[in-house]
């Protein structure tokens, strides 16, 4: 059994409650940290003829987000320039996207990805769905606050002007971050009632009562919904994912599928998205970068474990096969080594 699997099985036996948030992270706080020393090394790396990308990558992918904020502050104090602006000039392409992503706080990163998804003509629904379906109440509330700060407008307002119909209703309901998070009581009566109502509102009737689906799936707690989807199978000939495919289409179908997969197993959901970003010809780098940057300090160890379990090869191996150069080096550091 590989070390990642050993760690994970030990952690799942002990339960998550007593663990520090970084227990499943692949990027952790650097123990011998000195922001001024890092800022000086970055300044030298940026000024070097041809730019020393390796130093930039090694520093920024081996520090926690909090430490990266300290480095940016020290760099500005030292050079009177913003680190992100200096790196934007020094780097390009996918590597630039990774490094600039790492310099933002998690909520700044999510807010900027959401804004970019809704800017200009057309909407990148895929990004909108991934972020809004997978973040916790606390994360969503923080994203809303930071979005307001950065763009002087409400996230909800932008979602409303950029989407329509039931898809809009689902996105707005999720973005509020009002899901019940009390998991202390298991209400079997309500589990049964919700399962039956999901069935009655969809597969059982002609047409779909989408507002009913939205209410249940955006308001109930994750552990409650996991049990609801299990119970649902005793009413419906199809499981929840199959029912969604039969009942709704387009962006709404995609959003409900993403949401249910996130509720059932968030780390498997991200493993699937990573696999989809690299399978076949070409790479969907935006998705690959966003997940690697946003999950490396959250649950990347669990994602790697789910990835290997489902696809037979490690995430590290896939990244090695699918990317190259300094971009590859940065992603592999975020991945945290071979399983």
Curated annotation (Swiss-Prot):
Keyword annotations from UniProtKB, A to Z: Acetylation, Annexin, Basement membrane, Calcium, Calcium/phospholipid-binding, Extracellular matrix, Phosphoprotein, Repeat, Secreted
A Gene Ontology molecular function term of the record: calcium ion binding
Gene Ontology biological process terms, A to Z: bone mineralization; calcium ion homeostasis; endocardial cell differentiation; growth plate cartilage development; positive regulation of calcium ion transport; positive regulation of chondrocyte differentiation; positive regulation of plasminogen activation; positive regulation of receptor-mediated endocytosis involved in cholesterol transport
Cellular location(s): Secreted, Extracellular space, Extracellular matrix, Basement membrane
Record's keyword annotation contains Acetylation: yes
Keyword Acetylation in annotation: yes
Function, in words: Calcium-regulated membrane-binding protein whose affinity for calcium is greatly enhanced by anionic phospholipids. It binds two calcium ions with high affinity.
Full protein name: Annexin A2
Organism annotation: Gallus gallus
